[in-house]
Every structure is written in C-alpha cells, then in structure tokens.
Amino acid sequence: EACSVTTATTKEYVTFDGLKLSVKIAGKGRPFLFLHGLCGDALQPLELFPDDAGWQCHALESRGHGGSDIGDMRELSIRRLAEDATAYLESLDRGAAVIGGVSMGAAIALRLTAYRPELAAGLVLGRPAWVDQPAPANLAPHRQIARDLGQHDPGTARRMFEESAMAKTI
C-alpha cells in the first residue's frame, strides 16, 4: 500500500533566507528524502513510496511548488533547490538518509549527493530530467518558455510560444 497525502503529516521548514517550505512526512523508520518533479508536489513521491517499507518518507516541496513559498525567482536553480534539501536533511539530525527524486527531483538529489556524499546512505533516481547532457533536446521547449517569460509578460510569452514552430512539434 502506498503512502498518501491524507495520512502524511505536514510541517514547515524555514530556509536560511526565511522562505517556508512544506514537507509531508509518512511512514516510520530510517529517513528517505524523496523529491518531486517540475510542477509537482509531495503527492508525486508519496504515491510512489510504499507505506510499510520500514522507511520514513520526507517529501520536501521545492520553492514555488505545492505549499512552499517561491521567493526570488532569480534564485530558482537546481543548485538552490539542492541547497534547500541539504539544509532540510541537516535539520533532521538523523545521519545519512537515502535521497531520491523523480525528474527534476532526481537532478536535485544527484546534485545534493555529489556535493554532500556524507548525507547520502543511497541514491534513487526516477525518470531523471537528464543523464549525460547539460541541455538535452527534449528540454528545448522549457528553455524557450523561460527565455520568453524573462522578456515578456506571461500572456505575451504564452502566445509567442503557442505560435512558434517548436510548439507545433510537441
């Protein structure tokens, strides 16, 4: 049986810069930090995590996702999200945890583990957003949308993308 948001407890974690991040915790046992993908929330990892596995799932909602504050949008990066996850793990004071993620969460988990290996008892990567390339072709629409949003209001950026040749390919 999978963990569910209805049985998980919710707590707030406050980052070094004062943002409130939502964390949903389910299960009992050793800590497993499980991170969601882009535009996801705690439901994504909790649905995948078995209830009776002997682990305690910590589903940290990244900045701007789920119940978490967004903060300065210029600070949204895999580096910053990994720093948030690192600080959260350290706040648990329970030693090394298994760290995992889905898609964007996998990228965050990989960065956290690469820079702070002593915090990782294991690493689980599900559907990583990228593996061996810093900017694979399948993420080109995301880059285009980000550029358009950086230069135009959201409505104009949306229209521009919808009318683009790239949008017609997806």
Residue ranges with predicted function:
Residues 135-139, 150-170:
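Conserved alpha/beta-hydrolase catalytic His-Asp/Glu region
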Residues 36, 97, 101-106:
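Conserved alpha/beta-hydrolase "nucleophile elbow" surrounding the catalytic nucleophile
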Residues 31, 56, 95-98, 119-122:
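Structural signature of beta-strand start/N-cap positions in the alpha/beta core
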Residues 107-115, 120-150:
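Flexible "cap/lid" loop of the alpha/beta hydrolase fold
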Residues 12-69:
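Conserved HGGG/HGGXW glycine-rich cap/lid loop of the alpha/beta-hydrolase fold
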Residues 58-98:
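Active-site loop/oxyanion-hole signature of alpha/beta-hydrolase fold enzymes
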